[in-house]
Structure formats: C-alpha cells, structure tokens
Swiss-Prot record:
It holds the Pfam family Ribosomal_L29. Belongs to the universal ribosomal protein uL29 family. NCBIfam families: L29 (TIGR00012). PANTHER family: 60S RIBOSOMAL PROTEIN L35/50S RIBOSOMAL PROTEIN L29 (PTHR10916), LARGE RIBOSOMAL SUBUNIT PROTEIN UL29C (PTHR10916:SF0). This is Large ribosomal subunit protein uL29. Keywords: Ribonucleoprotein, Ribosomal protein. GO terms for molecular function: structural constituent of ribosome. Disulfide bonds: none annotated. CDD domains: Ribosomal_L29_HIP (cd00427). GO terms for biological process: translation. GO terms for cellular component: cytosolic large ribosomal subunit.
Length: 70
C-alpha cells in the first residue's frame, strides 16, 4: 500500500475522511489482535496504517481549524 500524497487526501470530502479514519482504526485494532495471537505476518502494516491515519487526522484538523477561523 503506497502512502497517499497529501494533495490526494485533501481532495476527499469530510465524510470520506471520517469513514477512512474509522476504517483504519478498526484495521489497527485487528492488527493488534493478530499480533497478540501470533497470526500477524506483515508487521509493516502497522506503520503504513498509522502513517495514513496521521495524514487523515492532519487534514481533518486543518479543515476544522480553518472553519473555526472563518
């Protein structure tokens, strides 16, 4: 999974961003569960998921701050 560019994330609607954030949080939960039960083989998925989550949360925070400033 390639990391999305910030410009690609900014093109998403607020609803899409929220939906993706929820999906990634669920995925991280599942990954932690798989790791605890020793079923996880691709540990690099943690980093990819956390990075994408951080990008989405950053764009979401930027939008909320710009809306509050307006």
């Amino acid at each position: 999974m390639a990391h999305p560019k910030a410009a690609e994330v900014r093109k998403l609607t607020d609803a899409d961003i929220t939906e993706q954030i929820d999906g990634i949080r669920r995925e991280l939960f599942d990954l932690r569960f798989q790791q605890a039960t020793r079923q996880l083989s691709n540990t690099h998925r943690f980093k990819e998921s956390r990075t994408k989550l951080a990008q989405l949360l950053t764009v979401q925070k930027e939008r909320s701050r710009s809306a509050a400033a307006s």
